[in-house]
Design a protein with these regions (language model features):
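Helix-turn-helix
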Residues: 4, 8, 12-46, 50
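Short secondary-structure transition hinges
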Residues: 83-122, 129-132, 140-141
């Protein structure tokens, strides 16, 4: 039941935004009582965190699958970018704009980015050793620029106007 609640929460939050969705909406969607829902998640924010953690875990699984199929760093990075953009396109503008308003969501996302930074730097350094990137590049700066590009695409809503194959 917990997984069904998380899936319903993801669908509603992504489609309508965080503020527009109530715990009542989630319970109605699943045809369960609010009491049952609150036994699983004591607050809307705890449900939001569970939804976010599930999405991050699924993304990580997909990246690990891609990494198992290829050693080419460029393919992995482009696949990750394409996967991220496809995921972001599922979100309403309201949802994306409201994420920063929730401290725990924002903190969780920053923590996730910090964890992934080490992996990203490893990919960049592997690309250097594979001869795919110039040896004098600053891996940290490349990572920060990549993050800034994604943030800008999201912030300005450009992810909806730029075809994926052009990214």
């Amino acid at each position: 039941l917990r997984e069904r609640v998380i899936a319903a929460g993801q669908e509603l939050f992504h489609k309508r935004g965080i503020r527009a969705v109530t715990m009542d909406d989630v319970s109605h969607q699943l045809h369960i009582s609010k009491r049952t829902l609150y036994q699983l998640f004591d607050t809307k924010e705890s449900l939001l965190l569970a939804c976010q953690q599930k999405a991050m875990a699924e993304h990580q699984q997909q990246i690990e699958h891609i990494m198992a199929e290829t050693d080419n760093v460029i393919e992995i990075i482009l696949s990750d970018l394409q996967l991220s953009m496809m995921e972001i396109q599922k979100f309403s503008k309201e949802f994306l704009n409201e994420i920063p308003l929730y401290d725990k969501l924002r903190e969780n996302m920053l923590h996730h980015r910090k964890e992934n930074k080490a992996n990203a730097l490893e990919f960049i350094n592997r690309g250097i050793s594979q001869g795919l990137f110039r040896p004098e590049i600053n891996a940290e700066m490349v990572y920060e620029v990549g993050v800034a590009i994604i943030d800008t695409l999201v912030e300005k809503g450009l992810y909806k106007t730029v075809p994926l194959f052009e990214l």
